[in-house]
């Protein structure tokens, strides 16, 4: 009876904790992520007295969590393929019962850790590249669904806290049709997903001024609540639920101590914390669990400093006159950060990247500990994006070593910038490692009931041995998990630690490197994470008192182990662990050597998270602006140009609109805003400067069967159609280019090299923005031409692609696979942009447009019609013809693949010869007189204006960036100055002392073109002469054929060079693989040798033990033999006695027989004996007759 009651109690308690904590074990073994549908939220005002279900019910019971098959779910150009088979999900493991012993799971943990280590050691071949998040949005039927963002007016993308769904690493996409939740496998994967989707919705985020809102909030504790109840809070921002705390039992106070952080928030008005009491399901009368709320105006906690206060709880039914009501202590900070376009931070980022050491030395004495932490965080994030973080940490650490001198014990014991920087870097790149190494161990410890208190003043003497055994067991397990985690140790940290070891050796102090590594990793990362798992995102819940004490003791032992120190008289009650410490020192030394050995750098991917570089630069600027103002003038003068740079950025911040780059205003505000109209700034410029007649729709060569569709639109670089909202993707077998070089930020395309494009209007939109689709703009503008009475500005028209070209996958690129060309902002291969900006032209125009990742889509008929219309001299007629069929035009891909007048090479699939475009056409005949200011549209289409000199259009083509750059999008087809193009360069633009913006450059170029046009109007030949020139062009077909063959030869030569380069790269890759496999083989041999040595040591120990056992057995045998001999003597004496007794017995039997015979004879004779004979036994065993005595 009692056993059954106990079992029911155990089951009830387990389910109680399961319902309370709602932390189902994460399925990290999942081969995919899954999508979920969020139910509609319920605002706190709409809720009745009863609270909604606790976290976890959503993911366990709601039937609407999986996407409906009837709902279309499509991402444009994104996950557009089906996977070949369904991917099964591993089952969720049940939570460990709280009253189960932690000791029971120790063998499982040990075997799992050993198996993981052995498995990792056995992997001599490189791992397969695991599937990225672009393959992880799967429905249960394994069909890929899509979410169409192209037609949405407003899309909200935000992370979902784990307390809402009971699942970590989720995010939500909210559109007009509803919201979808998606689950990822890690925080880094979730951040990359969210950023890619945000860039799909707002492609020009880095090129525009934006504002970001950040909230950090601690729900600490509550007081004046009824005892013996459990309480929890819900956090709502503007009446939208964002997170929940765990339920905590009331003792003195209800202590939660939980931290929440939210980024990319909309502007907030109020922060509301709702207080609930957990209801007991057994008591049906307890229905009203809602206790009240605390409302914080966002303005009251705005600023850089945290605000911590006790806030009264406003209850629904206040009871006056009965003392103070409940109160909650909350600590919060709400920040609004203004972020300028990336171009505005370029000089600032370059200065920080190159002069961080002097800056830190100047600011170290005046900064507070909190400011040092914030500044170190911003510096680490920025330098991680620029690839300089290893040098930064190494330089700071060596300066710290020089400062401390012989006082090695002071290193990492003070709040310096170096200490804070390594802390932030460990948190940045080591979060996943921390989860893999200690996550399961900490969770199991939370769920166990082992008591590890070993202080005699806090526990009884009878329980002390058991508690000491518990603590030793937990420490063994924790250290086992740590030393076996070397196989998943982050590659970046290994590189940093290896650099420290190398620098210490070069300074003649190799002994201090081990202290640096152990102190940084254990003192500043692992041990604090063990003591406070909630602060390191291992768990949300703050531990209870017993668990907190256990974690503190484990951290003490681990830290002493890392310091190679024993417990002394200060903590004498821990001295029983000294034997464990001494035993594990060797393993600790091996672990520290392993994680700092440059020869064992693994093939694993580097940091995969996303860094918002604009936000970090804005934060660092505000910190430096405040700090530099406090410095003395003598110190400020040593900072070089930094004060001026800070002033420039501050001026841009304080001037609304000054940070907006030309041509980027509201490009992504609505899907069609940039497509339906041209830039207001350009319209104003056209009106004021009377330039509308100068924008020319030019037909380059005479129409032939091969080149009759070659047109281009000259358009201002300040105008850019709004890109269609689409989502970026990458193939599963494509290298992860976005995170090359240690995970550069997507917005660092223009900040990683000092020789970036001079005078460009903005930084590139990023590596993941898909090609712009401008058909809608073309259709609307072409349709509007006939209705205009004045000449039409065609700047908003989309550029026209050659016939037979259409977007395709990046894998079809003619250049290096997977390495898209770097595009300047607003260029889209527009020749006008290239000429106006004075930029070196990319050689991408020399080959097929497939080098940009495009194949073809025919716009043949449109181009043919436009050519015919231009030939007839009536451009407006062609416009009217196209206006009648805008749908057909909109369906065709329109883009320009030839860069700015660079020699156009015919397509390889051309059916016949073509005249080269770079050959100057014959001089045109003089046009009829026309007003200077305006040119009619029909005149624009009939006149054959001479093109600018080849020095402007077809200048030499150096690389976009320098050889030392680490840009992810650097083109492999650009190899310096092209020898074929140099002879054609007539002149080059000289360097301008002032770098105008793109709009001014375009205006200047148009004015220049106007002057050339007017000069040619007065000097051109007459129309009959033009006809004769055309007949000469028709007779020069042989020259055209020769030009075509020369172009093909040049293309073949270029391809040959590319193939040679590719072959060299492949050869280098093969050599690297051979060296890597050789290193792995040597590592395997070394590992086998170490294993053999360990086995030899074990065998020697076993043999010595057997010999000692044999000696003990011999001694025992001798003792037993002596005992046997003594027993044998006793047995012999007993045998003799038994023999004598047998003889006496035989005589007795014979005497009895005689007596019997004697009595029987007397009875037959009738004589009765008067005196019966008495027999007596003598001493020697014989019988004696008593009558004879």
UniProtKB/Swiss-Prot annotation:
Induction: Down-regulated in prostate cancer and medulloblastoma.
Compositional bias per record (Pro residues), positions renumbered to this chain: 919-931
Modified residues (Phosphoserine): 728, 747, 978, 995
PANTHER family assigned to the protein according to its UniProt record, in alphabetical order: DISABLED HOMOLOG 2-INTERACTING PROTEIN (PTHR10194:SF26), RAS GTPASE-ACTIVATING PROTEINS (PTHR10194)
Domain notes: The C2 and Ras-GAP domains constitutively bind to MAP3K5 and facilitate the release of 14-3-3 proteins from MAP3K5. The PH and Ras-GAP domains, but not the NPXY motif, are crucial for its cell membrane localization and neuronal migration function. The PH domain is necessary but not sufficient to activate the JNK signaling pathway through ERN1. Exists in a closed inactive form by an intramolecular interaction between the N- and the C-terminal domains. The proline-rich motif is critical both for PI3K-AKT activity inhibition and MAP3K5 activation.
Coiled coil: 1026-1159
Top-rank lineage group of the source organism: Eukaryota
SMART domains to which the protein is assigned, alphabetical: C2, PH, RasGAP
Protein name in UniProt: Disabled homolog 2-interacting protein
Chain ranges of the Ras-GAP domain: 387-595
One of the record's GO molecular function terms: death receptor binding
Subunit-level organization: On plasma membrane, exists in an inactive form complexed with TNFR1; in response to TNF-alpha, dissociates from TNFR1 complex, translocates to cytoplasm and forms part of an intracellular signaling complex comprising TRADD, RIPK1, TRAF2 and MAP3K5. Interacts with DAB1. Interacts (via NPXY motif) with DAB2 (via PID domain). Interacts (via PH domain) with ERN1. Part of a cytoplasmic complex made of HIPK1, DAB2IP and MAP3K5 in response to TNF-alpha; this complex formation promotes MAP3K5-JNK activation and subsequent apoptosis.
GO cellular component labels: AIP1-IRE1 complex; axon; cerebellar mossy fiber; climbing fiber; cytoplasm; cytosol; dendrite; endocytic vesicle
Domain (PH): residue spans on this chain: 101-202
PTM summary: In response to TNF-alpha-induction, phosphorylated at Ser-728; phosphorylation leads to a conformational change, and thus, increases its association with 14-3-3 proteins, MAP3K5, RIPK1 and TRAF2 in endothelial cells; also stimulates regulatory p85 subunit sequestring and PI3K-p85 complex activity inhibition.
Family matches, as PROSITE patterns: C2, PH_DOMAIN, RAS_GTPASE_ACTIV_1, RAS_GTPASE_ACTIV_2
Compositionally biased region (Polar residues): 653-668, 715-731, 938-955, 966-976
Biased composition (Low complexity): 669-678, 852-865
Pfam families per UniProt: C2, DAB2P_C, PH_RASGAP, RasGAP
Gene Ontology BP, a term: positive regulation of neuron projection development
Disease affiliated with this protein: A chromosomal aberration involving DAB2IP is found in a patient with acute myeloid leukemia (AML). Translocation t(9;11)(q34;q23) with KMT2A/MLL1. May give rise to a KMT2A/MLL1-DAB2IP fusion protein lacking the PH domain.
Organism: Homo sapiens
Positions of the UniProt region annotated as Necessary for interaction with AKT1: 646-943
Residue stretches of biased makeup (Basic residues): 20-38
Membrane topology: Peripheral membrane protein
């Amino acid at each position: 009876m009692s056993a059954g009651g106990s079992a029911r109690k155990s089951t009830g308690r387990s389910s109680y904790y399961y319902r309370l904590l709602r932390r189902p074990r994460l399925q990290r073994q999942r081969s995919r992520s899954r999508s979920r549908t969020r139910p509609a939220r319920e605002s706190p005002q709409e809720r009745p007295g009863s609270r909604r279900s606790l976290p976890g019910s959503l993911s366990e019971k709601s039937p609407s969590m999986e996407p409906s098959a009837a709902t279309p779910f499509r991402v444009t150009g994104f996950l557009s393929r089906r996977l070949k088979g369904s991917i099964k999900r591993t089952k969720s493991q049940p939570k460990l019962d709280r009253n189960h012993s932690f000791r029971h799971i120790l063998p499982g943990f040990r075997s799992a850790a050993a198996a993981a280590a052995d498995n990792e050691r056995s992997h001599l071949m490189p791992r397969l590249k695991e599937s990225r998040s672009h393959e992880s949005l799967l429905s249960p039927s394994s069909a890929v669904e899509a979410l169409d963002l192209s037609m949405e007016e407003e899309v909200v993308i935000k992370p979902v806290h784990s307390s809402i769904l009971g699942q970590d690493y989720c995010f939500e996409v909210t559109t007009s049709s509803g919201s979808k939740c998606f689950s990822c496998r890690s925080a880094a994967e979730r951040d990359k997903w969210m950023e890619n989707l945000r860039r799909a919705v707002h492609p020009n985020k880095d090129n525009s001024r934006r504002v970001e809102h950040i909230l950090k909030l601690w729900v600490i504790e509550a007081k004046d609540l009824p005892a013996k109840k459990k309480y929890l809070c819900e956090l709502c921002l503007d009446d939208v639920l964002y997170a929940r705390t765990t339920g905590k039992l009331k003792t003195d106070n209800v202590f939660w101590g939980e931290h929440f952080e939210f980024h990319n928030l909309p502007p907030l008005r109020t922060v509301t914390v709702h207080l609930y009491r957990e209801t007991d399901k057994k008591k049906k009368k307890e229905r009203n669990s809602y206790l009240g709320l605390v409302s914080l105006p966002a303005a009251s906690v705005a600023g850089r400093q945290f605000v911590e206060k006790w806030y009264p709880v406003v209850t629904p039914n206040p009871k006056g006159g009965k003392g103070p009501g409940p109160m909650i202590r909350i600590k919060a900070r709400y920040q609004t950060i203004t972020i300028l376009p990336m171009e505005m931070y370029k000089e600032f980022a370059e200065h920080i990247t190159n002069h961080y050491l002097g800056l830190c030395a100047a600011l170290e004495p005046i900064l507070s500990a909190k400011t040092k932490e914030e500044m170190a965080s911003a510096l680490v994030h920025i330098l991680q994006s620029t690839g300089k973080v290893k040098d930064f940490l190494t330089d700071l650490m060596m300066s710290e070593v020089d400062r401390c001198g012989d006082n090695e014990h002071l290193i990492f014991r003070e709040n310096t910038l170096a200490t804070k920087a390594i802390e932030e870097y460990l948190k940045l790149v080591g979060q996943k490692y921390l989860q893999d190494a200690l996550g399961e161990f900490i969770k199991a410890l939370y769920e166990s009931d082992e008591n590890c208190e070993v202080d005699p003043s806090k526990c009884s003497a009878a329980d002390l041995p058991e508690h000491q055994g518990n603590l030793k067991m937990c420490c063994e397990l924790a250290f086992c998990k740590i030393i076996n985690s070397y196989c998943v140790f982050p590659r970046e940290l290994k590189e940093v630690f290896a650099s420290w070891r190398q620098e210490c050796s070069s300074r003649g102090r190799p002994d201090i490197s081990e202290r640096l590594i152990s102190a940084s990793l254990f003192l500043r990362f692992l041990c604090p994470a063990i003591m406070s798992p909630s602060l390191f995102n291992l768990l949300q819940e703050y531990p209870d008192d017993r668990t907190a004490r256990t974690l503190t003791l484990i951290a003490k032992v681990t830290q002493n182990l890392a310091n190679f120190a024993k417990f002394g008289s200060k903590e004498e009650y821990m001295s029983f662990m000294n034997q464990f410490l001494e035993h594990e020192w060797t393993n600790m030394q091996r672990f520290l050597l392993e994680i700092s050995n440059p020869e064992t750098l693994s093939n694993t991917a580097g940091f995969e998270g996303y860094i918002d570089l604009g936000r970090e630069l804005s934060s660092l600027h505000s910190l430096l602006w405040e700090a530099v103002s406090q410095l003395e003038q003598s110190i400020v003068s040593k900072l070089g140009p930094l004060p001026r740079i800070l002033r420039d950025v501050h001026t841009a911040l304080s001037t609304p609109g000054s940070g907006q780059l030309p041509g980027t205003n509201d490009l992504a505000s609505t899907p069609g805003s940039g497509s339906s109209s041209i830039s207001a700034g350009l319209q104003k410029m056209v009106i004021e400067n009377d330039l509308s007649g100068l924008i020319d729709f030019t037909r380059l060569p005479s129409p032939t069967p091969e080149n009759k569709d070659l047109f281009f639109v000259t358009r201002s670089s300040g105008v850019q159609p709004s890109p269609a909202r689409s989502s970026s993707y990458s193939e599963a077998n494509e290298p992860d280019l976005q995170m090359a070089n240690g995970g550069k930020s997507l917005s660092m395309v223009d900040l990683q090299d000092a020789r970036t494009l001079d005078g460009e209007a903005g930084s590139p939109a990023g590596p993941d923005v898909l090609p712009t689709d401008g058909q809608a703009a073309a259709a609307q503008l072409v349709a509007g031409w006939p209705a205009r009475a004045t000449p039409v500005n065609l700047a908003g028209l989309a550029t026209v692609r050659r016939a037979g070209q259409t977007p395709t996958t990046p894998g079809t690129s003619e250049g290096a696979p997977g390495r898209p060309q770097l595009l300047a902002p607003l260029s889209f291969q527009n020749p006008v942009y290239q000429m106006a900006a004075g930029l070196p032209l990319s050689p991408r125009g020399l080959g097929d447009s497939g080098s940009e990742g495009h194949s073809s889509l025919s716009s043949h008929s449109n181009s043919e019609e436009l050519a015919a219309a231009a030939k007839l001299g009536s451009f407006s007629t062609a416009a009217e013809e196209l206006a009648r069929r805008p749908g057909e035009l909109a369906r065709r891909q329109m883009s320009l693949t030839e860069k700015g007048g660079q020699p156009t090479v015919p397509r390889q699939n051309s059916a016949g010869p073509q005249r080269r475009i770079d050959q100057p056409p014959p001089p045109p005949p003089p046009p009829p007189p026309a007003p200077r200011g305006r040119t009619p549209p029909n005149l624009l289409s009939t006149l054959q204006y001479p093109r600018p000199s080849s020095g402007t259009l077809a200048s030499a083509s150096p690389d976009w960036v320098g050889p030392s750059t680490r840009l992810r999008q650097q083109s492999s087809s650009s190899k310096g100055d092209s020898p074929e193009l140099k002879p054609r360069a007539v002149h080059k633009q000289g360097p301008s002392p002032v770098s105008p913006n793109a709009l001014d450059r375009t205006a200047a170029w148009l004015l220049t073109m106007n002057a050339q046009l007017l000069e040619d109007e007065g000097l051109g030949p007459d129309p009959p002469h033009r006809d004769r020139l055309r007949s000469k062009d028709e007779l020069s077909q042989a020259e055209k054929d020769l030009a075509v063959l020369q172009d093909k030869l040049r293309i073949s030569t270029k391809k040959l060079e590319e193939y040679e380069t590719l072959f060299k790269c492949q050869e280098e890759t093969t050599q690297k693989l051979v060296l890597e496999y050789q290193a792995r083989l040597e590592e395997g041999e070394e590992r086998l040798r170490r294993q053999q040595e360990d086995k030899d040591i074990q065998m020697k120990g076993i043999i010595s033990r057997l010999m000692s056992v044999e000696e003990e057995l011999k001694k025992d045998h001798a003792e037993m033999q002596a005992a046997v001999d003594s027993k044998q003597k006793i047995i012999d004496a007993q045998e003799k006695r038994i023999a004598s007794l047998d003889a006496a017995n035989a005589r007795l039997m014979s005497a009895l027989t005689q007596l019997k015979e004697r009595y029987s004879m007397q009875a037959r004779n009738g004589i009765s004996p008067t005196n019966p004979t008495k027999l007596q036994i003598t001493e020697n065993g014989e019988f004696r007759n008593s009558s004879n005595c």
